[in-house]
Amino acid sequence: MIEAPPFDKSLGMLYYVTDTCPAGGVIKARPEDFIVEEVLKDGTVVALTGISLKPRVGSWTWIHVVKKNTDTLKLLLYLAKTLGLKARDISIGGIKDTRAVTSQIISIRGDVTNLPKIRNVEFLSFWPMDKPITPSLIYGNRFTITLRNVEKVDCAEATLKTLQYIALPNYYGYQRFGTIRPVSHLLGKALVKKDAEEFFDIMFCKIFAYESDVAKKAREAACKGDYRRALEIFPKRFIEERAVLRGLLRGLDLWNAIMSIPIQILRIYVEALQSYLFNLFLSKRMELGPLNRPIEGDLVEINGQVVHYAEGLGGEVVLPTVGVGVKMPRGKVGEAVLQLLKREGVEPSMFLKMPRGLRVYGGYRKVVLTLRDFRYAVDKEVTVSFTLPRGSYATVILREVVKPEEPYRHGF
């Protein structure tokens, strides 16, 4: 176990579990280098080449969607707007990577016949179904990833060999927070604290080196109070920023202007805060001992039930995702969790005091990443394939290989 660089630490990922040398390389030199195929609960892979499902009579349509370089959430918002549907009439089993080629099922209420043509999006097959696709119907995702421009192939091979037997920390990965603008969790903290000014400052006054010149100019204008000019500069893809600016120009107060951001996006911010806190908890737990060996005070999951560990009990170690209704660890682990919450100025009750649609309850997440069907090949490029359960991040594995100082420069 070695210390991670400052960028990772800012997201709560304080350590690498491997002590091998950095391989370098780029993970998304082209979208085809990062392939994600959804895996249903019964093991069916929603393959890029096609899938056969048994239709059921009902009020939903399941659609096999293959997309490239396309944001999942923005695709759903566009479909809802184009088809005249409400957000609850479209559902997915999980959000997929944007800079990638991804294959998944989406479901739309009703009989869908005329879907719009969308660049880089293919609708391959349609099935009538009696219920929507939801996260509970998804096992996870199968990944096939090519790492190019590897600087030290021997370092990559050493890390990949180590990953076959080591207990990997189940961190929330970079894309949960952003790599160009790693602020999703900070916006989430401002939301749960109901601090509109802090939210505004993070969204518009915090500017990062790898942002486009257009985005930088727009943020500078907004930060100086020139909302109309900022709105003119921001391209349409900046949905959140434009929503806040339009609200302010309509005369809304700052909080209500922020609340005009689509609820799905606001919820992502709140969940990013939960993810950041979990990463901090997990990093602290790594300091206290091996993740695959429960210690006094740990929470463990046994047959779907979460209990406090007792000697001889067994079970897999879990940590809480902060919110209402979850048990907290005891002993040294519990003390560390409480100290971290105090340092971050967050209380579990804050998550329940949010406006309707943003209230999130707590839960539990395994501390060890479950890695299945792991294979790799090392040549000029490095190719890796594996299957992960829903909610786990491929970039957590790849960061161990690349060990990037600046993740964005390496395609993360």
From Swiss-Prot:
Keywords: Isomerase, tRNA processing. Its EC number is 5.4.99.27. One of its GO terms (biological process) is tRNA pseudouridine synthesis. The active site is at D97 (nucleophile). PROSITE patterns: TRUD, UPF0024. InterPro entries: PsdUridine_synth_cat_dom_sf, PsdUridine_synth_TruD, PsdUridine_synth_TruD_CS, PsdUridine_synth_TruD_insert, TruD_catalytic. CDD domains: PseudoU_synth_ScPUS7. GO terms for molecular function: RNA binding; tRNA pseudouridine(13) synthase activity. Residues 167-370 form the TRUD domain. Gene3D superfamilies: 1.10.1510.30, 3.30.70.3160, TruD, catalytic domain. It holds the Pfam family TruD. HAMAP family: TruD. Belongs to the pseudouridine synthase TruD family. Could be responsible for synthesis of pseudouridine from uracil-13 in transfer RNAs. This is Probable tRNA pseudouridine synthase D. It comes from Pyrobaculum islandicum (strain DSM 4184 / JCM 9189 / GEO3).
